């Protein structure tokens, strides 16, 4: 199949046209006075949103060359959102500003590669300054402010996330799911919970709640399937003598062994409950190890030469309370030693650092939360499905942003932090050579783009606002578009996580540099394109 090609300035100009169209649509949502964007759907009614990444995802341009430029910036906006939870609009606005000014200089005869090097040096200096300007989050209220700003100034979402983070801790897991009512609710799970329930309903102790409740329980952790009754009987006899209930967690329990357990339960000889071990393969073994650490027990594993028939009471874990329902098991207040739990937590943290897989990271984080933190499940409620999906997306963004704030600290918001990186970038210019200086100047001019855009969306001249903020000469003072006043942004609750601003700038500069050093575009012909006149500069 024949391809159509576009070269040099013609190629870059078409990509810029695509980036401009994308940025114009996305940038209108920026700031507290940002406007709504209405997106037509192929089914159902139109979606009304003020979320930059939602708008970006929907954009598909008719012109293939323009679409290539737009799609590359959309990818960067999405990557910024995935990494930091917010900053998609900021990244798009910065990418447009850097690419547009860079292209103007390249057309005038500057060296694209040198400009890109200059951009990279300037961004490195700006990021170092951002990290230096940042400070740790102090208190629940600042976490709430970060969440609210990320969720398009929704204070309810900010407060909700601040409460959840305070409850589960920084190592805790917060999951957001679609609810079944009109109200948004938060459910907290204390202790360790995993998604496996009782293997037989005969283990239930409370028929009103359909739960098996074991107080001051002993916990047997067995890696294999419980199949031989003779192996199990000695342990059951020892456990019955203590008068304590027994929780058995194993790969599976076969019919014969299950019958033995159920008969003992129904006769009142022993309060017992059996559940399948969570996870699969190596992950199952790791999770059983976590439960062993939490309860102070030993994982009975044939790899270690241990047999079920030789298990004594010393090998069993202990927990103050165990609750088992049809699909979940919750272990509260295990008897594990604090130092052993801390070692296990440190080991999981090291694994999180070492892995490159997002899926593995998520699973490690879940294990960490169950050992060191807690779990909060936010069920999003709304009047309509469209509203629910929008609220859920905003909640997820805000959750990432609040975690980013706790991780790397916070900065004054509203584009103030970027504007006050000018001195650091100007210092970097002294070390630049030749056309690299132009690259540094391009970043210098782009740093105020987010503040200009926020002001423009509020109906105020962005250039005037930037000049006014620079004249104040105070890194905390900025323009609060919500009130229309110049104020201390941190005190006003207008704050951004360091990670969000830093990631947005780094990603924007990266894609702009890539676009500026692009020399050729290659794409397929569309059927109808054959009847159109060739575009100037196009070779086919």
UniProtKB/Swiss-Prot annotation:
GO molecular function terms attached to this record: ATP binding; ATP-dependent protein folding chaperone; isomerase activity; unfolded protein binding
Domain of life according to the entry: Bacteria
Enzyme Commission numbers on file: 5.6.1.7
Any Gene Ontology biological process: chaperone cofactor-dependent protein refolding
Compartments in which it is found: Cytoplasm
Gene Ontology CC terms: GroEL-GroES complex
Entry keywords, A to Z: ATP-binding, Chaperone, Cytoplasm, Isomerase, Nucleotide-binding
Main location: cytoplasm
Catalytic activity: ATP + H2O + a folded polypeptide = ADP + phosphate + an unfolded polypeptide
Pfam families: Cpn60_TCP1 (PF00118)
Binding-site list for ATP: 29-32, 50, 86-90, 414, 496
Function: Together with its co-chaperonin GroES, plays an essential role in assisting protein folding. The GroEL-GroES system forms a nano-cage that allows encapsulation of the non-native substrate proteins and provides a physical environment optimized to promote and accelerate protein folding.
Entry-linked NCBIfam families: GroEL (TIGR02348), PRK00013.1 (NF000592), PRK12849.1 (NF009487), PRK12850.1 (NF009488), PRK12851.1 (NF009489)
Family per similarity comment: Belongs to the chaperonin (HSP60) family.
Annotated PANTHER family: 60 KDA HEAT SHOCK PROTEIN, MITOCHONDRIAL
Quaternary structure, from the entry: Forms a cylinder of 14 subunits composed of two heptameric rings stacked back-to-back. Interacts with the co-chaperonin GroES.
Protein name: Chaperonin GroEL 2
Gene: groEL2
């Amino acid at each position: 199949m024949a391809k159509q090609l576009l070269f040099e300035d013609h190629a870059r100009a078409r990509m810029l046209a695509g980036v401009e169209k994308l940025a114009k649509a996305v940038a209108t949502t920026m700031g507290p006075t940002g406007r709504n964007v209405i997106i037509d759907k192929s089914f159902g009614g139109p979606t009304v949103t003020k979320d930059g990444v939602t708008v970006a995802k929907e954009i598909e341009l008719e012109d293939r060359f323009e679409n290539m430029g737009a799609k590359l910036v959309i990818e960067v906006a999405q990557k910024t959102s995935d990494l930091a939870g917010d900053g998609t609009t900021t990244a798009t606005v910065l990418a447009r500003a850097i690419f547009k000014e860079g292209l103007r200089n390249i057309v005038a005869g500057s060296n694209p590669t040198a400009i890109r090097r200059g951009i990279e040096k300037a961004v490195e200096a700006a990021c170092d300054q951002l990290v230096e300007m940042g400070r740790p989050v102090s208190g629940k209220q600042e976490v709430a402010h970060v969440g609210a700003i990320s969720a398009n100034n929704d204070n309810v979402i900010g407060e909700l996330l601040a409460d959840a983070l305070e409850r589960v801790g920084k190592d805790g897991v917060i999951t957001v799911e679609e609810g079944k009512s009109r109200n948004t609710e938060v459910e907290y799970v204390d202790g360790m919970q995993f998604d496996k329930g009782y293997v037989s309903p005969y283990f239930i102790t409370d028929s009103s709640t359909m739960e098996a409740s074991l107080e001051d329980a002993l916990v047997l952790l067995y890696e294999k399937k419980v199949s031989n009754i003779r192996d199990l009987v000695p342990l059951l006899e020892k456990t019955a003598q203590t008068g304590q209930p027994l929780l058995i967690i194993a790969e599976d329990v076969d019919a014969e062994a299950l019958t033995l357990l159920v008969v003992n339960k129904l006769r009142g000889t022993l309060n017992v409950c059996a559940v399948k071990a969570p996870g699969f393969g190596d992950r199952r073994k790791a999770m059983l190890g976590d439960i062993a650490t939490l309860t102070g027990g030993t994982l009975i594993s044939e790899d270690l030469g241990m047999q079920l028939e030789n298990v004594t009471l010393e090998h069993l874990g202990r927990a103050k309370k165990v609750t088992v329902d049809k699909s979940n098991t919750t272990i509260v207040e295990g008897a594990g030693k604090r130092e052993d739990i801390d070692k296990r937590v440190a080991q999981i943290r090291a694994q999180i650092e070492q892995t490159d897989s997002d899926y593995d990271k998520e699973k490690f984080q879940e294990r960490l939360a169950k050992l060191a933190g807690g779990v909060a499940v936010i069920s999003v409620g709304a009047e309509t499905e469209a509203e629910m999906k929008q609220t859920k997306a905003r909640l997820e963004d805000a959750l990432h942003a609040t975690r980013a704030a706790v991780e790397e600290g916070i900065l004054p918001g509203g584009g103030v932090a970027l504007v006050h990186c000018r001195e650091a970038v100007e210092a970097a210019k002294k070390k630049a050579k030749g056309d690299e200086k132009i690259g540094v100047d391009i970043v210098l001019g782009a740093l105020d783009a987010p503040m200009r855009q926020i002001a423009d969306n509020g109906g105020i001249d962005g250039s005037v606002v930037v000049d006014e903020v620079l004249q104040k000469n105070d890194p905390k003072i900025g323009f609060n578009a919500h009130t229309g006043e110049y104020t201390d942004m941190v005190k006003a609750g207008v704050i951004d996580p360091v990670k969000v601003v830093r990631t947005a700038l780094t990603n924007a500069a990266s894609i702009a540099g890539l676009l500026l050093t692009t020399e050729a575009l290659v794409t397929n012909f569309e059927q109808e394109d054959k009847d159109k006149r060739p575009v100037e500069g196009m070779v086919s």
